[in-house]
Swiss-Prot record:
It comes from Bacillus subtilis (strain 168). This is Sirohydrochlorin ferrochelatase. Induction: Up-regulated by sulfur starvation and repressed by cysteine. Also induced by O-acetyl-L-serine (OAS), a direct precursor of cysteine, maybe via inactivation of a putative transcriptional repressor of the cysH operon whose activity is controlled by the intracellular levels of OAS. The lineage of its organism: Bacteria, Bacillati, Bacillota, Bacilli, Bacillales. The keyword rRNA processing does not apply. Keywords: Iron, Lyase, Metal-binding, Porphyrin biosynthesis. The gene is sirB.
Amino acid sequence: MKQAILYVGHGSRVKKAQQEAAAFLEGCKAHISVPVQEISFLELQEPTIETGFEACVKQGATHIAVVPLLLLTAAHAKHDIPEEIVRVASRYPSVRISYGKPIGIDEEVVKAVYHRMKDIGVPYENARVVLIGRGSSDPDVKRDVTGIANLLQEMVPVKEVIPCFLTACGPNYKEVFSELEKDDGITTFIVPYLLFTGMLMNEIEREVQKLKAHNPNVYLSSYIGFHPHVKNAFLNRVRETAANSEGQFDFDGGSYASAAH
């Protein structure tokens, strides 16, 4: 058996985000002792999943571990990536495939959130944290972001952690911001739970500037991005998918739900 890893990033229109994702994935390769490792993206960016998968096969891979670089569990992880794998893999029926989980709820990413807060240089004890996720109609997204918020509350001595979302589920972050316009004297950290920069981050920056006109005790952190703790969490996902010790990551050509995720 010849093992391969196929990393699957989301892809972006923004050049800086493209470069950050590609550099991050290239940097992961040195930490994984697998002979064949290829990078791909779901959309908006080359190489495609098809190109990456075929590159693995051409190098003799008989088992490909497909690992999505996604913070949250939603449609991309459950449907879009699996559907593309099914389409491409149908040409290579002898290749065994395992399929990994998104990062999800993980102490390592909670540490990344904490460090983004700490980087601001303002005392965080008894502060309020507003954690902004992308949002989705998929309930697992709300579950993931809420779970991360709860873990942060347990691990860091803050007053409260409020999970909210940019779109598609509630509470919407603008609703939370409107409640923060009245300065109650509590330091508030706004933490964008996003992997890369782009239109969503720009939108948050604009809204925080408006909020600060009413409440100067509001501080915006950097987006989570590819922090070393995010890297740790992702590498754990890569290793468990490649090992697939109990077959729990087997991909049988069905939907995401067909695997024991």
